[in-house]
């Protein structure tokens, strides 16, 4: 336990995926303000989020993003979907469109959102280097790439003198841990930080869902009533996942009794204290939300201490239960 207490806590990044979709501009402004008031400074968005509304809303908040005197870091991504690609022209179009929406001269971190298997990666990386030389972004990031692709990209960039990626954003939570086996050693070798998305498994690890719910009428959320819902159900909505959650809930009751933390709190505490994320390496957890109340609850949980060993063991048991059907971290 002393090792856990002394370990540097991973940073927290605000995930802006729901801005412009489940959160309107005033709510998004309140959420951003609450996040920054807690002392956090980094916001994650993407060209594709809410069809551009996420970036547009963030750009209208008066944060002076990308300015030399701005303490807020802004991250965005280019995607090879919906008529876009990672070819040089599309890459430039997406980044320059993002800069206009965000009303900033450059972003702090520019990700390749996922691999473009129809474009030679050398073309994409050369174009990224050119955009970096033009001052349009500070750091290069990768997301949803396989470990071997990360190694290939780092080697190509190094040998050609191109900007090297320094951040990898990937799917990671207490019951989705495929990244630990091969990706994490790769990232440590090449010196990339890891930013975790889906820390609550799209909301499944809040414990508010039941497996049978998929057959009934559901409110709009990550699993129902939106463009990405089927992808999230395919990723997480499996009987073994719900059995794993039940194991953890039982352990929470046994360890804490009437004062047991919520499933959400326990899951986030696992991320910050018991996962393989390391604050000393600059790793971070991306916290998404669909309301101000949800963000405040998640931020409070992120500031709490380590879990009882029996609960950590239960999370490990849950992981072993679902390992065989863990969704791939790469695309």
Curated annotation (Swiss-Prot):
Any one of the GO BP annotations: aldehyde metabolic process
Modified-residue entries (Phosphoserine), positions: 6, 85
Enzyme class: oxidoreductase
Reactions it catalyzes: a primary alcohol + NADP(+) = an aldehyde + NADPH + H(+); aflatoxin B1 dialdehyde + NADPH + H(+) = aflatoxin B1 C(6a)-monoaldehyde + NADP(+); aflatoxin B1 dialdehyde + NADPH + H(+) = aflatoxin B1 C(8)-monoaldehyde + NADP(+); aflatoxin B1 C(6a)-monoaldehyde + NADPH + 2 H(+) = aflatoxin B1 triol + NADP(+)
Name of the protein: Aldo-keto reductase family 7 member A3
Function comment: Catalyzes the NADPH-dependent reduction of various carbonyl-containing compounds, including aldehydes, ketones, and toxic products from cellular metabolism or environmental exposure. Can reduce the dialdehyde form of aflatoxin B1 (AFB1) into alcohol derivatives, via monoaldehydes intermediates. Can reduce the dialdehyde form of aflatoxin B1 (AFB1) into alcohol derivatives, via monoaldehydes intermediates, thus preventing the formation of protein adducts that contribute to AFB1-induced toxicity.
Inhibition and activation profile: Inhibited by citrate.
Phosphoprotein among keywords: yes
């Amino acid at each position: 336990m002393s090792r856990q207490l002394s370990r540097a806590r991973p940073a927290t990044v605000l995930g802006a995926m729901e801005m412009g979709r489940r959160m309107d501009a005033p709510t998004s402004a309140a959420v951003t303000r609450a996040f920054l008031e807690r002392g956090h400074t980094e916001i994650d968005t993407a060209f594709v989020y809410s069809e551009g509304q996420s970036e547009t809303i963030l750009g209208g908040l008066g944060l002076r993003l990308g300015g030399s005197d701005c303490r807020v870091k802004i991250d965005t991504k280019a995607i090879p979907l919906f008529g876009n690609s990672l070819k040089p022209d599309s890459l430039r179009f997406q980044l320059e469109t993002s800069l206009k929406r965000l009303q900033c001269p450059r972003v702090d971190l520019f990700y390749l959102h996922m691999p473009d298997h129809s474009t030679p990666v050398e073309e994409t990386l050369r174009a990224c280097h050119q955009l970096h030389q033009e001052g349009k972004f500070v750091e290069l990031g990768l997301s949803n790439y396989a470990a071997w692709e990360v190694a290939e990209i780092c080697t190509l960039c190094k040998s050609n003198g191109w900007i090297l990626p320094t951040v990898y954003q990937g799917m990671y939570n207490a019951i989705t841990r495929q990244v630990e086996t091969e990706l994490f050693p790769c990232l440590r070798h090449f010196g990339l930080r890891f930013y975790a998305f889906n820390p609550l498994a799209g909301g499944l690890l809040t414990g508010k869902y039941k497996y049978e719910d998929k057959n009934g009428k559901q409110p709009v959320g990550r699993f129902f009533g939106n463009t990405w819902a089927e992808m999230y159900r395919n990723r997480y909505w499996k009987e073994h996942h719900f059995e794993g959650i039940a194991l953890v809930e039982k352990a929470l009751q046994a360890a804490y009794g009437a004062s047991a933390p919520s499933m959400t709190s326990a899951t986030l505490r696992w991320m910050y204290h018991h996962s393989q994320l390391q604050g000393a390496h600059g790793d971070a957890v991306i916290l998404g939300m669909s309301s101000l109340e949800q963000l405040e609850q998640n931020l409070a949980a992120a500031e709490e201490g380590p879990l009882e060993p029996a609960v950590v063991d239960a999370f490990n048991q849950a992981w072993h239960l679902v390992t065989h059907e863990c969704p791939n971290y790469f695309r």
